[in-house]
Amino acid sequence: MLGRQGLTELFFESVEPELAELPMVKFLKRFREGDYEFEGIRNDGIELESEVEFTHVIPCGPEVLPEEGTVLDPASPAVIKWEEVEEVVDPAATDEEGETICTDPENLGQDLGIDSYQVIVENDDIHLIVDLTSDDRSLTVPPELLEDNTLYIFEVLAKEESGNQTITEGYFCTGPDLSPDDCEDLFESL
């Protein structure tokens, strides 16, 4: 049975340990920079082979708006905005709370090239995924997709030329009957 299964996409993902448990610099030592070869055989017997470069150039997460807990008018478009990502994660540095610190890529001898952004907006009824260019800085969600008194979670992904990506998550609610505190309560109840 397993011999007849195949893949349409392949992503290497894991549940990374908290930085307090395993500092990023140690985590990245497990996956050294360099070229990696992948080989496989399709169901029809054709051999596949690929070589990819793995880098430690990790873009910092985009700074996003609206701020978490913002309540928007459902009759108006919701505009998700972000700043251009110009910094990278410094794997050797964290702040007092164990969060990563961003720095100019030149400080680490790196070049950062944002290839594209992706925005995901979702709740129980919608799952919107939009791919955007590296020049784009906003996504407008039309009011036709918004419902009254509803929580929406969004993610803005910054995708680096190497394929590395970082996600910033946010959320907003629509009115007219929800307050910012209600919106926060809805998010925390997930």
Role assignments for model-derived ranges:
Residues 31, 37-45, 143-168:
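Beta-strand-rich modules
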Residues 72-111, 141:
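Conserved aromatic anchor
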Residues 1-19, 124-131:
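Extended, solvent-exposed segments with strong compositional bias
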Residues 46-63:
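Proline/serine/threonine-rich low-complexity linkers at boundaries of modular beta-sandwich domains
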Residues 11-38:
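Ligand-binding face of N-terminal immunoglobulin V-set domains in extracellular IgSF glycoproteins
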Residues 115-119:
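Short beta-strand elements bearing conserved aromatic residues within extracellular beta-rich modules
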Residues 23, 126-128, 134-142:
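Short S/T/G- and acidic-enriched coil/turn segments that sit immediately N-terminal to beta-strands
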Residues 44-51, 159-189:
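Extracellular fibronectin type III
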